């Protein structure tokens, strides 16, 4: 199948003299100031669950807290639960190693750890009773978030940590 281009076709726009000059200028600036081509200075790392029901809420939460496009993202079943629960012990090293390299490469200052309501990984880690007992669900997730916070304080003491439990509507209950 062929595609014929006409002069106004946007898929293969011709580069004008002005466009060529802009491209050359951008290249010259990058060559003159290589730091501009390096990593951006990220502020945080978001650690949350693989559940697609919380993806949009997580992005919205980070943007609302001033982190839009300023954070790295570690996604694992259960989020912080996956990093600390004994049921997922085989995963722990992967998370802590990833946090260390994120600090090294991105110079982050903070970790945001979000669990969420009705989390299958939380049920695996702490029992099916969490499905029907919201108080128990809150207690177990809060305990996991405090363990997560303590683990970060031990391994990366310069980092700040924010933790919370996200409802499926995107609202977050802060856990200190």
Map each language-model feature to its residues:
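Short, conserved "active-site rim" segments that organize catalytic pockets and cofactor/ligand binding
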Residues: 23-24, 38-92, 166-172
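A structural motif corresponding to the C-terminal end of an alpha-helix
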Residues: 105-106, 148-161
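N-terminal secretory signal peptides and thylakoid transit peptides that target proteins
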Residues: 4-27
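MPN/JAMM (Mov34/JAB) isopeptidase/deubiquitinase module and associated MPN-bearing subunits/adaptors
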Residues: 4-10, 154, 160-176
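Short, flexible loop segments at boundaries between secondary-structure elements
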Residues: 139-149
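Short HxH-centered metal-ligating active-site micro-motif
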Residues: 2-3, 69-132, 137
């Amino acid at each position: 199948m062929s595609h014929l281009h006409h002069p106004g076709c946007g898929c293969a726009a011709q580069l004008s003299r002005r466009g060529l000059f802009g491209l050359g200028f951008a290249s010259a600036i990058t060559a003159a100031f290589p730091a501009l081509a390096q990593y951006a200075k990220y502020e945080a790392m978001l650690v949350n669950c693989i559940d697609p029901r919380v993806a949009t809420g997580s992005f919205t939460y980070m943007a609302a807290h001033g982190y839009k496009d300023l954070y790295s993202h570690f996604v694992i079943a259960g989020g912080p639960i996956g990093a600390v629960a004994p049921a997922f012990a085989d995963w722990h090293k992967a998370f802590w190693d990833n946090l260390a390299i994120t600090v090294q490469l991105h110079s982050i200052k903070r970790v945001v750890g979000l669990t969420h309501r009705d989390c299958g990984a939380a049920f695996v880690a702490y029992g099916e009773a969490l499905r029907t007992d919201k108080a128990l669900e809150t207690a177990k997730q809060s305990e996991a978030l405090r363990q997560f916070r303590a683990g970060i304080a031990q391994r990366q003491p310069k980092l700040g940590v924010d933790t919370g439990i996200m409802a499926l509507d995107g609202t977050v209950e802060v856990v200190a």
